[in-house]
Every structure is written in C-alpha cells, then in structure tokens.
C-alpha cells in the first residue's frame, strides 16, 4: 500500500509540475522576447550627432566627387596626401573601384547627388572597368588610372577580386530597386544591369581554387 501511495503521489506531483510549466511557459517566453526587444532597440542619434556624421560623410564624398573624373578614366585613385609633391597616386585596385561604386550610391542615398548624376557616374565607372584587361574575368589587383594598364607584377588577389564582385551585387540590387521609380532612366539602368550581370557571370574563381587544400 505504501508503495502504491508513493507511486500515486509521485505521479500526481509530476502531472502537477507539468501543468504548472505548461501554464507559465507563455509568460516566460513573452518576458524573454521583451528583454530581447529592449536589447536590440537602436539608439537614435540626436541632431548634433547626426550633423557630425553627415559632415564626415560629405567630406569623405568630396574625394570621390573630385577624382572620379575623365582624367583618371573614372578609376578612383588609391590615395591622396597633402604633404607630398604628387598628392594623388595614379593607381587603383579592384577593391578601390568597388568602393567607388558604393560611394556613388551612398552619395545618392544621402542626397549629396541626384539620380541622374548617380547613374552617369556608375555608367562611367563600369564602362571603363569593362575595358580593363582581366584574367579569367578577374580584375588584376592594381591598374594605372591614366593608362588603364595592369601594374607590374601582375597578380590576382582572391580577396580583392571577391570584394569587387560582392560590390557588384550591391549595386545590382540598388539599380533594381530604383528602376521602378525612375522610368525616364529605365534604359540606362537596364544597360548597367546588363554590364554588371556580364561581369559577375564572366568572373571565374575556379582557377584560383586549390583542390588539394580544401
């Protein structure tokens, strides 16, 4: 009898505990969710902080705005230094080119330039990149911005080439999103998308992959 009593008591307690857990689980999960929401809330910048960040963005954009020009074949120079005779260097990399594309669409998003200038700059950059000598579709790591020739020694950087293709996907998404709102520029946008898609499809990373060291 004692054994039966213990069994029934254990069974009832077990059932009771399960019942309590079943009842309070929604409350526990709700509390956890609220705590996560509080932790993930983004603290917004005040006006002074926002003005400060925008000012930095404008001054950063000035570099691209000044040097993305016909003189440099719309290939953004690698760097600029005030304290040397030749302040600007006549070389660029695939990562630099990709960053210049992102700088252009960011300048549009921040309303530093209008949509027409944005599309014109993207077109000038991409049409010049089309004419650059490549290896299996991959951009070489360094080019002369005046002659558009690869710098010696010629080599491919998997990191920089991968960066560039990643930037192309970002620009592609941007163009697809703005196309709906800009019917007057639809043909130009379609042409840019065609250039980008061809560049992505023609960039072959397989020769850079070492199958013996997976």
Annotate the PLM regions:
Residues 1-213:
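Acidic, mature catalytic/reactive cores of soluble proteins
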